[in-house]
Amino acid sequence: MTPRLVGGIVGALKREMGGASAMLTSFEAKEDGSVSIAGIYPGKVMPVTLVAGQEFVAEQSAFLAAEDTVQYTFQTVGLGAAFFGGEGFILQKFVGPGTVFIHIVGDVVEHDIDGAPVDIDPGHIAGFDATLQYKIKFVDNVRTAMFGGVGLFLATFTGKGKVYAHSVSKFKLAAEIYLEGQQTAHKK
């Protein structure tokens, strides 16, 4: 087990500014053994295997681990996505070859995009193939957004590739746990 700076001083500063740790821990087997990884919310750990040059984009907090052959950087998105989309201002971009392990809150919902535009709640997006283009748009019907539990913004994906989504957003999960705790506290 060895702590190391990823991408040198500049890479470490970018990671720190993106809300991630400047240091990563590297594990190398000297004999048979295993390393366990887990997210902080109930959910799934999903391996994403990338061939040489293949790119994958994930939300900032989804990254758990990667093989040392995988390169990763941060990618910024528009201010609309940052403040209203739930995705955050900074995304992580991974370039193969190698396997990246990401954490998905709840179950994994996989969307195959093949040309036709697909709208997804930005708070549910865990990661997607970099072959896809996406933009954040305002929901057409404000009444549906307010009373339908959808949110004010949607991410529209076009192109060809896959989007991996959370079955429940982190914000919704946290709110449900908080509300359940409040109801339990008031019953005592």
Task: Outline where the language-model segments fall.
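Phosphate/adenylate-binding glycine loop and adjacent helical scaffold
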Residues: 1-188
